[in-house]
A protein has these predicted regions:
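Transmembrane beta-barrel outer-membrane domains
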Residues: 71-75, 108-117, 151-155, 198-202, ...
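Outer-membrane beta-barrel "beta-signal"
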Residues: 347-349, 373-394
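Detector for outer-membrane/organellar transmembrane beta-barrel domains
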Residues: 213-335, 392
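Positively charged n-region of N-terminal signal peptides that target proteins for export
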Residues: 1-4
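Outer-membrane beta-barrel translocator domains and adjoining extracellular loop/strand segments
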Residues: 44-49, 106-112, 138-145, 183-197, ...
Length: 394
């Protein structure tokens, strides 16, 4: 209840700020949508992720989550946001506060408030939680399924950003909140690993450059990060260590008549938490002198087509995948390859109302035990959007 009170207070403050603007040029936009998903999964998947396609959440062994699939109903995609635009001398202060109902982390599987954006910028500087420059949100296709292509870089992060070039062509450089995860593999549960804790002495550094074209754009991005861990166990053997993570991305949108082609290729080491659906950043590598942590190489790819049949009828279809180069200390059932594909038919009879049906397929392959599993995901969705602007002379 307290969270709802805070949310309501923020909205009301935004409205009040607009109403009190001296020159009438300040503006507040309230927007969002209500979305309902109804569908079925052919196979039993991780119940915390019952309404999305995530190859990493398919079972790693037979009957891990049960024998058969199930029907699902969900409103977790429902979204609400507030944007403000305030004159500040020769510049403009822009803020975005946006949330949805899709629980993750400790709230995985729940219908609860999840912060998407809490971000502000003025001129060439920005701060807050927003899209990482390493990702390209315009690669995301018009899917009904919430999670999206597993092979794209996708991460909202707390950051400080500098944008020396803005517009259709742009350059962004950011310092981002660091973080990572580890897979202890065959060494999981061993006493000598129990006292190891992560440490991040430096922020992640990311950058993007987009070149605007007449029929779309081409974008390149990169990221560098330091991942450290410390052994706090009072033993003669010190398992502390560190690795450097890095990643490169190339992406594009090409507009061809009534079509938009969305493409991305990502490769790096130790950047799995910047990917849309990938496992741990660090794995165990066994050597003649023992075992050490290594940054796991990852490659992701996305190829989707959005096609408009008419002004009211459209389709999105495509394929994506993630490949992990597993270390020799990871367990045989560790995640190795994930594939993702779907096609849909969307209909918008009037503005702000949309319905559609979608058929999706995903597949998981393990590291070395020969296990693989496929799942078919079918859903119908109904979406009602709203947007209202206050102020700005209106």
């Amino acid at each position: 209840m307290k969270r709802w009170i805070v949310v309501l207070a923020v909205v009301m403050l935004g409205i009040a700020a607009t109403a009190q603007a001296e020159n009438g040029k300040s503006r507040t936009e309230i927007y969002g949508y209500v979305m309902t998903d109804v569908g079925v999964n052919q196979k039993a998947i991780d119940p915390s992720w019952f309404d999305v396609q995530r190859p990493t959440k398919l079972p790693a062994f037979e009957n891990e989550f049960g024998r058969d699939g199930s029907v699902f109903f969900s409103v977790r995609q429902t979204r609400f946001g507030v944007k403000s635009f305030l004159p500040a001398g020769d510049a403009e202060i822009k803020t975005t506060f946006e949330w949805e109902m899709f629980g993750v982390g400790a709230d995985a599987g729940q219908t609860t408030i999840r912060l998407r954006h809490a971000y502000g910028e003025v001129g060439k500087f920005g701060a807050g939680q927003y899209w990482s420059p390493f990702m390209d949100i315009d690669v995301f296709p018009n899917t009904l399924e919430y999670w999206g292509p597993n092979g794209m870089a996708f991460f909202r992060n707390v950051q400080l950003r500098f944008m020396p070039i803005q517009g259709d062509s742009r350059l962004t450089i950011a310092l981002e909140r660091p973080g990572a995860s580890a897979d202890a593999g065959l060494y999981a549960g061993r006493v000598e690993l129990a006292g190891i804790v992560p440490r991040f002495p430096l922020p992640d550094v990311s950058a993007e450059y987009r070149m605007g074209l007449r029929r779309g754009y081409i974008e390149v991005a990169g990221i560098v990060r330091t991942i450290k861990w410390e052994d706090l166990t009072p033993t003669p053997v010190d398992a502390s260590g560190d690795v450097m993570g890095w990643g490169l991305s190339a992406s594009s949108n090409l507009k061809l008549g009534g079509n938009v082609v969305r493409l991305q290729l990502v490769h790096g080491e130790g950047i799995e938490n910047y990917m849309n659906d990938a496992p741990a950043d660090v794995g165990i590598e066994v050597t003649t002198s023992g075992a050490d942590g290594v940054a796991l190489p990852v490659t992701g790819a996305v190829a989707f087509l959005d096609h408009n049949w008419t002004s009211k009828l459209s389709t999105s279809l495509g394929y994506s995948q993630v490949v992990i180069e597993n270390s020799n200390g990871q367990a045989p059932d560790a995640f190795h390859l994930g594939q993702y594909a779907l096609a849909n038919l969307l209909y918008s009879p009037v503005p702000n109302v949309m319905g559609g049906v979608e058929v999706g397929w995903d597949k998981r392959e393990n590291n070395s035990d020969g296990w693989s599993i496929e799942n078919w995901h079918v859903q119908a969705s109904f979406k009602y959007s709203f947007s209202v602007s206050l102020g700005g002379g209106q």
